[in-house]
C-alpha cells in the first residue's frame, strides 16, 4: 500500500465515495480512500435508498438535487448502474400546518428548478393505487423527478468514477490511529501500514465518533436502529402498470415504495426509538444487522395498514433492521473539524444515499478552493460545541428520529436535551415569562409572555413583541445578550493579524469600535465581528454565537509563525446585558459614577467602568438602533448587575425584550446579519457593504482584497455585471412576513422563473410595515423599484427602500 497521499478519506460508504468522486473531478486524484471492509459494509448497504427532493432548506435542497442529477448520469460515465428509479414522490399533508409548510417548501424548490405540484386525494390515489384511505389527507406534495436508487450500485458507481480519474481505494484496511505531524501533515496508521497525508477526512459513518476520538474530537453522532419491512409479492402491486412514487405519510410516520412486486414500508417510530453502539461499535462488524423488533413498530404498522389495506393483509417476507447515523439537528457534519487544520468531516447523514454526492461535491470545493458555492453553515461540524455532550446528542437525536416526518413550526424549539447552558439570571427571566430558544447550547429568551401558538402566519406572540418594541423605542429595554461569541486578541502583533483579516480598517484609538468583515481568498464573507480596541496590543471581538468555534479557528489559524498573538475565547466567562432606548442613559447614570454624556462617551466607543460595583466593558452600541450600551462583565457577577439595572429601570418603565423584538428592530434599521444576508458565497459587492470595505488606503492589504477588486470591476458602476444584489424592501404582506428563502420574481416575466430569494424579514412594529431583505436582479436595485415575493403560494409586491425604515440618519443612536 502507498505510504503518502494528498488526502486520505476514512470510510467507504456513500459519503466517503461521494467525496472521493468529487475530489477526483476537482483534480485531487492523489487521494486514497481506506475502508476496513468492503465498500458500503457499514450502514450504506442496508439503506432503503430513498432520495427526496422535498426539504425546507434551500442549501440542503441543492445537496439533494446533486444526488439525483449525478445518479441519472453515472452509468453513462462509469458503465455501472446506480439502480436509479425516477418514480417521483408524494408527501401527504394531514393537517393545515403541514399544508402551509408544503406551500413554503414549494417556493424553496422552485428557486433551484425542482418541479413540484400540490395535488388532491384523487390524484394521489391515481399515482399510488395501493393507497385507499385518504380521508384525512389535505393535499399531497408531488415531486416528479426524485425517487430511489440502489445503495450498493450508487456507491460502486461513484467509486468507479473516481478510480477512472486516478483516485485509489484500499479495502480491508483498518485505521487504528491518526496523529498530527510537526510539519502540519497527518499520519494515518492502519493495519496495513502508515500513510502520511496533507489532509484527512473522517467519513467513517457510525464509526465516526471512534475515528474522531483518535484526534481528540467528540463527534456528535449516534446511531439509531431503523427498520423497514418488505411484504410478500402483492397482486395489486404486480397489476400496477407504473412504478408508484415513493410516498411519505406523517400519520403513520412511514415511507412506502415499490420493491419489485412487493411493498416496502419503513416506519420512523414516534416513541421508543433505540440507539446503537453509544459506548463504541465493534471494529470487526461488516454488513451487520440487528435483530428485528416488531413490537416497537406495531402502532405505526397498524396506521400504515389503515392507509394501505393490502399491507395489513400481506405476509412479511423480510425485515431489515440496522443502525443509521443521526445528529442532534438531523443534518450531517461536513467541513473542517473544530480546532484542527486540514482534518475534515463528511459523516453523520441519516439519508446518506441522498446526501453523499452533494456533501462530497461541496466539501471538495471547500478543500480545493477554500469556500463553497452554497451556504454550508447548517452542515458545518462547528455548529456544535463542547456543550453537545453524548447525553445531549442521544436525547436530541432520538427526538429528531421520532419527528422525522413531522412539521417543525416557526419558533418551535423542542425540549429534548434542554436546558444545556443557562445564564445565572435564567430563573429570574423564567419567572417573568421568558419563552426560550436554544442557540449554540445557550437558553435565550425569544419574548416574555404566554407560550406561543406556533404558526406559519403571525402568531399570538405578534402583539407581545409589539409591546416590547414600543417599550424599547419609547422608554428603555433590557436584554440578556450573553449568547454572543467573545474573544480577546492580545500581543504585539494582534493589530497585524486583525488588519490582515479585516476588510474594514481597525479602530485607531483606544476605546474605538468598528464593524468588520473577514473574507475568504475568493472574497466571500467568512466572518462578521465588532472589533473594540482596548489598547494597541489588546482587542475585544464579538460575533454571532453560532460562529464561536468557526471564528476562533479563523483567527487562530491565520496567526503567522513567530507572531506574538494570543487568541482567547472568553465566551463562557463573560455575560452581556444590553440597556437600550431613549432613557438608557438615565438608567445607567443611577448605577455608575462614570460620565455617560455624549461628549465623554460617544457612539461606537467603549470604556472599562464599574456599574453597580461590577467591572464592565461598556460598549456604546445597539443592535436595535437606539441610544444604548452593552455591558460585558464577569458572568458570576451577572445577578448583581441585573438586579441593580432592573431596580434603576423601574421608574423609567423598563421592559424586558427578547430575540423576536431584537430581530424586528434590527430589520427596521436595515442591519444585515451574518448567516442570513452575509454568507461565504456572497461578496461585499453583492451585499452592498461598500462602506465597510477599505479598498482605497494605499499599501493596505487584507485577505480577499484582490478578489473583491475584481468583483467590483466586473460589477460596473451600475452593478449590471452581477447576477444579483441585496436590496431592502417593504412588502405588502397581510398576515405573514418573510422568514427567508421565499422566491422573488420579475412581475413582467411571464415565465414565472424565480430571479432571487429573500434572506429574512419581519413586521416592523415601529414603522408599521412588513420589511425584508432579498437578493434580486440588479435591474431592481434602485429605490422605488417593485418586484414580487411568493408567500405561501400568493404573490406580494415588494418595493425597494432607499434607506432604513427607522431613523435612517442614526440620530437616536447618537443621542
Model-found features: residue ranges?
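Flavin-dependent oxidoreductases
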Residues: 18, 177-290, 299-310, 389-413, ...
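Glycine-rich FAD pyrophosphate-binding loop
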Residues: 24-45
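Central beta-strand plus flanking loop segment that forms part of the substrate or channel wall
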Residues: 48-53, 89-91, 217-242, 299, ...
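Dinucleotide-binding Rossmann-like beta1-alpha1 core, especially the glycine-rich loop
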Residues: 49-127, 251-256, 260-266, 398-410, ...
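Flavin (FAD/FMN) cofactor-binding and adjacent substrate-gating region
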Residues: 73, 85, 94-171, 176-184, ...
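C-terminal catalytic lobe of FAD-dependent flavoproteins
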Residues: 251, 260, 280-417
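Acidic, proline/glycine-enriched N-terminal capping motif
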Residues: 381-519, 524-526
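Conserved, structured C-terminal
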Residues: 409-437, 444-446, 450, 457-460, ...
Amino acid at each position: 500500500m502507498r505510504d503518502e497521499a494528498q488526502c486520505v478519506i476514512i470510510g467507504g460508504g456513500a459519503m466517503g465515495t461521494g467525496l472521493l468522486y468529487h475530489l477526483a473531478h476537482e483534480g485531487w486524484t492523489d487521494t486514497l480512500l481506506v475502508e476496513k471492509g468492503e465498500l458500503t459494509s457499514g450502514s450504506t448497504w442496508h439503506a432503503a435508498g430513498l432520495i427526496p427532493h422535498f426539504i425546507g432548506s434551500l442549501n440542503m435542497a441543492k445537496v439533494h438535487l446533486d444526488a439525483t442529477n449525478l445518479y441519472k448520469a453515472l452509468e453513462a460515465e462509469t458503465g455501472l448502474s446506480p439502480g436509479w428509479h425516477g418514480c417521483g414522490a408524494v408527501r401527504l399533508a394531514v393537517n393545515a400546518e403541514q399544508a402551509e409548510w408544503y406551500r413554503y417548501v414549494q417556493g424553496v424548490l422552485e428557486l433551484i428548478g425542482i418541479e413540484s405540484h400540490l395535488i388532491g386525494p384523487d390524484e394521489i390515489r391515481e399515482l399510488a393505487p395501493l393507497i385507499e384511505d385518504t380521508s384525512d389527507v389535505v393535499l399531497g406534495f408531488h415531486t416528479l423527478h426524485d425517487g430511489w436508487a440502489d445503495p450498493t450500485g450508487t456507491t460502486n458507481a461513484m467509486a468507479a468514477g473516481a478510480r477512472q480519474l486516478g483516485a485509489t481505494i484500499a479495502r480491508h484496511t483498518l485505521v487504528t490511529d491518526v496523529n498530527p505531524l510537526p510539519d502540519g501533515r497527518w499520519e494515518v496508521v492502519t493495519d496495513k501500514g502508515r500513510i502520511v497525508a496533507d489532509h484527512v477526512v473522517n467519513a467513517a459513518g457510525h464509526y465516526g465518533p471512534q475515528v474522531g476520538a483518535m484526534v481528540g474530537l467528540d463527534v456528535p453522532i449516534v446511531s439509531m436502529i431503523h427498520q423497514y419491512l418488505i411484504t410478500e409479492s402483492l397482486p395489486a402491486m404486480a397489476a400496477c402498470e407504473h412504478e408508484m412514487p415513493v410516498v411519505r405519510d406523517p400519520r403513520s410516520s412511514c415511507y412506502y415504495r415499490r420493491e419489485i412486486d412487493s411493498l416496502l414500508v419503513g416506519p420512523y417510530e414516534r416513541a421508543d426509538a433505540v440507539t446503537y453502539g453509544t459506548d463504541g461499535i465493534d471494529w470487526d462488524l461488516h454488513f451487520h444487522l440487528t435483530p428485528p423488533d416488531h413490537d416497537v413498530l406495531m402502532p405505526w404498522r397498524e396506521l400504515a395498514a389503515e392507509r394501505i389495506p393490502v399491507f395489513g393483509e400481506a405476509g412479511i417476507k423480510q425485515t431489515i433492521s440496522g443502525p443509521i447515523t443521526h445528529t442532534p439537528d438531523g443534518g450531517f457534519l461536513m467541513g473542517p473539524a473544530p480546532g484542527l487544520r486540514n482534518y475534515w468531516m463528511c459523516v453523520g447523514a441519516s439519508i446518506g444515499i441522498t446526501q453523499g454526492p452533494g456533501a462530497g461535491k461541496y466539501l471538495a470545493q471547500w478543500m480545493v478552493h477554500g469556500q463553497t458555492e452554497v451556504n454550508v453553515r447548517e452542515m458545518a461540524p462547528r455548529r456544535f460545541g463542547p456543550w453537545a455532550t453524548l447525553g445531549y446528542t442521544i436525547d436530541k437525536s432520538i427526538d429528531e428520529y421520532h419527528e422525522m416526518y413531522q412539521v417543525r413550526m416557526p419558533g418551535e424549539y423542542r425540549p429534548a436535551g434542554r436546558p444545556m447552558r443557562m445564564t445565572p439570571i435564567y430563573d429570574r427571566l423564567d419567572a417573568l415569562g421568558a419563552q426560550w430558544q436554544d442557540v449554540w447550547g445557550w437558553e435565550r429568551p425569544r419574548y416574555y409572555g404566554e407560550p406561543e401558538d406556533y404558526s406559519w402566519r403571525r402568531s399570538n406572540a405578534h402583539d407581545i413583541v409589539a409591546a416590547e418594541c414600543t417599550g424599547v423605542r419609547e422608554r428603555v429595554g433590557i436584554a440578556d445578550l450573553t449568547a454572543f461569541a467573545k474573544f480577546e486578541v492580545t500581543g504585539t502583533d494582534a493589530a497585524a493579524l486583525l488588519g490582515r483579516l479585516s476588510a474594514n480598517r481597525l479602530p485607531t484609538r483606544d476605546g474605538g469600535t468598528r464593524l468588520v468583515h473577514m473574507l475568504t481568498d475568493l472574497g466571500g464573507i467568512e466572518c462578521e465581528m465588532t472589533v473594540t480596541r482596548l489598547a494597541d496590543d489588546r482587542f475585544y471581538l464579538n460575533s454571532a454565537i453560532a460562529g464561536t468555534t468557526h471564528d476562533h479557528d479563523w483567527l487562530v489559524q491565520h496567526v503567522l509563525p513567530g507572531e506574538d498573538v494570543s487568541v482567547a475565547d472568553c465566551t463562557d466567562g463573560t455575560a452581556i446585558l444590553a440597556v437600550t432606548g431613549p432613557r438608557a442613559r438615565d438608567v445607567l447614570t443611577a448605577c455608575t459614577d462614570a460620565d455617560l454624556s455624549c461628549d465623554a462617551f460617544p457612539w461606537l466607543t467603549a470604556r472599562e467602568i464599574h456599574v453597580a460595583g461590577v467591572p464592565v466593558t461598556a460598549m456604546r452600541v445597539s443592535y436595535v438602533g437606539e441610544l444604548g450600551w452593552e455591558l460585558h462583565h464577569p458572568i458570576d457577577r451577572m445577578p448583581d448587575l441585573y438586579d441593580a439595572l432592573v431596580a434603576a429601570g423601574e421608574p423609567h418603565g423598563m421592559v424586558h425584550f427578547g430575540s423576536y423584538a431584537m430581530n424586528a428592530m434590527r430589520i427596521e434599521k436595515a442591519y444585515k446579519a451574518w448567516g442570513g444576508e452575509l454568507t461565504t458565497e456572497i461578496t461585499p459587492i453583492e451585499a452592498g457593504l461598500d462602506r465597510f470595505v477599505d479598498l482605497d488606503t494605499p499599501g493596505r492589504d487584507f485577505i480577499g482584497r484582490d478578489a473583491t477588486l475584481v468583483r467590483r470591476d466586473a460589477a460596473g458602476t451600475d452593478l449590471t455585471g452581477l447576477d444579483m444584489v441585496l436590496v431592502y424592501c417593504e412588502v405588502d404582506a397581510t398576515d405573514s412576513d418573510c422568514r427567508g428563502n421565499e422566491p422573488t420574481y420579475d412581475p413582467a416575466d411571464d415565465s414565472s422563473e424565480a430571479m432571487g430569494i429573500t434572506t429574512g424579514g419581519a413586521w416592523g412594529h415601529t414603522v408599521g410595515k412588513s420589511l425584508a431583505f432579498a437578493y434580486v436582479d440588479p435591474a431592481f436595485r434602485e429605490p422605488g423599484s417593485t418586484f414580487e415575493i411568493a408567500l405561501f403560494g400568493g404573490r406580494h409586491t415588494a418595493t425597494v427602500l432607499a434607506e432604513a425604515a427607522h431613523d435612517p440618519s442614526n440620530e437616536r443612536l447618537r443621542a
